[in-house]
A protein has these predicted regions:
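Short, exposed "boundary/linker" segments that immediately precede the start
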Residues: 1-7
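Short glycine-rich phosphate-binding loop at a beta-alpha junction
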Residues: 196-208, 212-213
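A short acidic (Asp/Glu
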Residues: 8, 124-129, 209-218, 235-238
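Short, flexible loop/turn elements at secondary-structure junctions
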Residues: 31-33, 83-88, 99, 118-123, ...
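Non-catalytic, compositionally simple segments
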Residues: 8, 12-114, 123, 142-179, ...
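Short, surface-exposed connector motifs at secondary-structure boundaries
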Residues: 192-200, 219-223
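Metal-dependent DNA phosphodiester-chemistry modules and their immediately adjacent helices/loops
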Residues: 13-46, 215-306
């Protein structure tokens, strides 16, 4: 609204002595706290002195109720409707949102899928996923990769049991101290040859993926470029959030993917667009969450074609 222009432009310029206008009196109406917005509607007048004429109380009440369960709505509302400055990132999912202990109790063999990867740099965690939709449930098959020589260091840094996850079959260790993306290719090929799961499209971020993409294309996979930007990932991330909250994503209770989802923040812009971001520590891996969001982005592009194939 106009309050943002008044607040951020003339006030800043006036304080920096860029302009000299004695007729300019910047004035910002705001709340004393965020909590009072949710506990006392009578306080809304503080940041909305024209409430009832320019802006209706019913509008604020509707958006306030929606914001309780929607991070991007909350950030946008606090900034635009109550003039409270927001940070760029916030927690994306609660544990109850992301936790789903359901297992794959139906056969996923001989299915059409959406594939996706988040390829790390040479020494970090890498993730590949297959997404299969059946009867409104999205079944996710994730698999993770890490260089063998850095595993002990990563166990100490990340404080998670990579060695146990490897023993349980959730994690493949590559020889040496660098990732071998040909093992990611091998995993996709095994799903095709052993399980009859055919990824119709495989999404990837073009950064660091040139040679791997060529290898996959030579084997007949259709590769889909998905750049990791806020406008590309916002809608699929919101859709994944809604599906997780409604328990429509069955990831076979994979502990690494669950940990990655718990580590993921939502970086938010002023328009309520979101994209995945790490929690404050650089050791909080989010690769599985990013790969799954990329899979959702590919599904959005080809939803009609995919749903026709899986009927």
């Amino acid at each position: 609204g106009n309050h943002r222009n008044l607040h951020s432009f003339p006030t800043r310029r006036s304080s920096d002595l860029e302009i000299n206008d004695e007729k300019l009196l910047p004035w910002l109406y705001t709340q004393d706290s965020q909590d009072e917005i949710y506990t006392d509607k009578k306080t809304w007048q503080k940041s909305n002195p024209s409430l009832g004429s320019i802006k209706l109380e019913s509008y604020l009440e509707d958006i306030m109720n929606k914001s309780k369960n929607d991070l991007s709505t909350r950030v946008t509302m606090l900034c635009k409707d109550f003039n409270i400055k927001q940070t760029e990132s916030g927690s994306w999912l609660t544990y109850s949102d992301l936790n789903n202990e359901s297992k794959h109790t139906i056969s996923l063999k001989n299915s059409y899928a959406i594939g996706a990867v988040d390829l790390s740099n040479t020494t970090d965690l890498t993730c590949a996923v297959l997404l299969i939709q059946k009867d409104n449930i999205k079944y996710v098959l994730p698999h993770f990769f890490m260089p063998k020589d850095v595993m002990l260091k990563r166990i100490e840094e990340d404080s998670v049991p990579y060695d146990l996850w490897h023993q349980q079959g959730f994690l493949t260790l590559t020889d040496g101290n660098q990732n071998d993306f040909s093992l990611v290719t091998k995993w996709f090929m095994e799903r095709v040859q052993k399980d009859g799961i055919r990824p119709l499209w495989v999404g990837y971020d073009p950064w660091n993926a040139l040679y791997w993409v060529k290898e996959m294309e030579e084997l007949g996979f259709t590769m889909e470029k998905v750049r990791q930007g806020i406008y590309t990932l916002s809608e699929p991330m919101k859709q994944l959030e809604a599906d997780l909250k409604n328990k429509l994503v069955n990831y076979n209770n994979n502990p690494i993917l669950k940990w990655n989802l718990a580590n993921t923040q939502a970086k938010i812009d002023i328009n309520g667009n979101i994209q995945p971001s790490k929690l404050s520590s650089k050791f909080r891996r989010i690769d599985g969450a990013v790969a799954l969001i990329i899979a959702y982005a590919v599904l959005n592009r080809y939803r009609n074609e995919y749903e026709q194939m899986v009927k």
